[in-house]
């Protein structure tokens, strides 16, 4: 059973574009007012609330009168520029009506994937919370490109939740939770009120995005769940289409709870695990996969194949022979040297490379292993 939201310490709420913006009418002001009432109730109860809000591009399209057809990159960026101003003002007005201050944070992928910028972003948001302001966070779509972006705010919200040590992430969506199949396609789909671990079977239940205003679907929400749950953050998926969507959770309206890992990883490994776009991928043999699960470092001898271009210290994914990701870590070699030593014993590395080097390709202190259930283990 879901506990009352007021019993959480810090909550990240993600709001999708389709909830905020109507293609013809623009901003759904009445709905936003109802959300503001929910946030205010939690805020005045001592709960810290952070908002990750989509909607800048969708709102900017309306503001600028752009056509319904797919936008070019520069048109999307222009729409975001216009929409961000309108969106920030709307939140400031709504929350200000409850004597709550807000602050806008626009981030790019590198703000969470590069350690120094990650720490700076965290410090800024933490300061806003100490000042009793509600941070309103969105991807900076005015400068993000197709190649370098989060791509959806579900995973951004999960990254924010883990970065800020939130104990709950709420994804407000156009669907009221997870089903065994997309319910709009399969009338026999069964609703799942609780997910203890996100298994491959759970992932297979995900469908595609249902709205042209949204970039994310159930798959991205499950990706968000894996990031959040591994760091000890619970996640709820519920419908945001009703007025007062947060208080609706407390009233017992339908929602799916994803339980956090029982043994969450530490802050350093949370950052590694949450990296959204690994720079490369290493395929390892069965022996290496077994060694990683027992807490060992990844040695070159067990590496069968290397994909991608990366530098020393970049985050890479480790795959088993079936192509499934089993770990993620910071690699001790660049791609060129890694390819040279792959498959070789550690005592051969110096002779191959011509300099003294580390025995491990990824040290266990820089490695996060995914258990079969998708929970993270150190």
Curated annotation (Swiss-Prot):
Entry's Gene Ontology BP terms: L-proline biosynthetic process
One CC-aspect GO term: cytosol
Enzyme class per UniProt: transferase
Transmembrane region(s): none
Keyword ATP-binding: yes
Gene3D superfamilies reported for this sequence: Acetylglutamate kinase-like, PUA domain
PROSITE patterns (UniProt xref): GLUTAMATE_5_KINASE (PS00902), PUA (PS50890)
Main localisation: cytoplasm
Binding annotation for substrate: 54, 141, 153
UniProt pathway annotation: Amino-acid biosynthesis; L-proline biosynthesis; L-glutamate 5-semialdehyde from L-glutamate: step 1/2
Domain called PUA: residue spans: 279-356
Known function: Catalyzes the transfer of a phosphate group to glutamate to form L-glutamate 5-phosphate.
Family: Belongs to the glutamate 5-kinase family.
Name assigned to this protein: Glutamate 5-kinase
């Amino acid at each position: 059973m879901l506990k009352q939201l007021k019993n959480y310490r810090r909550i990240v709420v993600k709001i999708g574009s389709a909830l905020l913006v109507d293609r013809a009418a623009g901003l759904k002001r009445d709905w936003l007012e109802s959300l503001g009432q929910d946030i205010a109730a939690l805020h005045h109860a001592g709960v810290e609330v952070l908002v990750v809000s989509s909607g800048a591009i969708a709102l900017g399209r309306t503001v600028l009168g752009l056509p319904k057809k797919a936008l070019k990159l520069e048109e999307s960026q222009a729409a975001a520029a216009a929409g961000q101003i309108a969106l920030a003002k709307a939140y400031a007005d709504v929350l200000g009506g409850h004597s709550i201050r807000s602050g806008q944070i626009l981030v790019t992928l590198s703000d969470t994937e590069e350690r120094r910028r990650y720490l700076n972003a965290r410090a800024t948001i933490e300061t806003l919370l100490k000042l009793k302001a509600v941070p309103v966070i969105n991807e900076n779509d005015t400068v993000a490109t197709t190649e370098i972006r989060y791509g959806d705010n579900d995973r951004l919200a999960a990254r924010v939740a883990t970065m800020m040590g939130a104990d709950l992430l709420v994804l407000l969506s156009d669907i009221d939770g997870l089903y065994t199949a997309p319910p709009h396609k399969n009338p026999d789909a069964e609703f799942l009120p609780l997910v203890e671990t996100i298994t491959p079977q759970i992932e297979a239940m995900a469908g595609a995005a249902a709205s042209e205003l949204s970039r994310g679907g159930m798959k991205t929400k499950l990706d968000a769940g894996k990031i959040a749950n591994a760091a000890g953050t619970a996640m709820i998926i519920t419908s945001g289409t009703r007025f007062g969507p947060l208080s609706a959770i407390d009233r017992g309206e339908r929602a799916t709870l994803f339980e956090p890992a029982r043994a969450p990883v530490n802050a350093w490994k949370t950052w590694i695990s949450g990296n959204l776009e690994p720079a490369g991928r290493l395929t390892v043999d069965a022996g290496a996969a077994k060694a990683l699960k027992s807490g060992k470092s990844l040695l070159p001898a067990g590496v069968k194949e290397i994909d991608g271009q990366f530098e020393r210290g970049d985050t890479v994914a480790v795959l088993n022979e079936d192509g499934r990701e089993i770990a993620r870590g910071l690699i001790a070699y660049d791609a060129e040297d890694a390819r040279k030593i792959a498959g070789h014993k550690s005592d051969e590395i110096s002779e191959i490379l011509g300099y003294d080097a580390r025995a491990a390709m990824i040290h266990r202190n820089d490695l996060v292993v995914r258990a079969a259930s998708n929970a993270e283990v150190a």
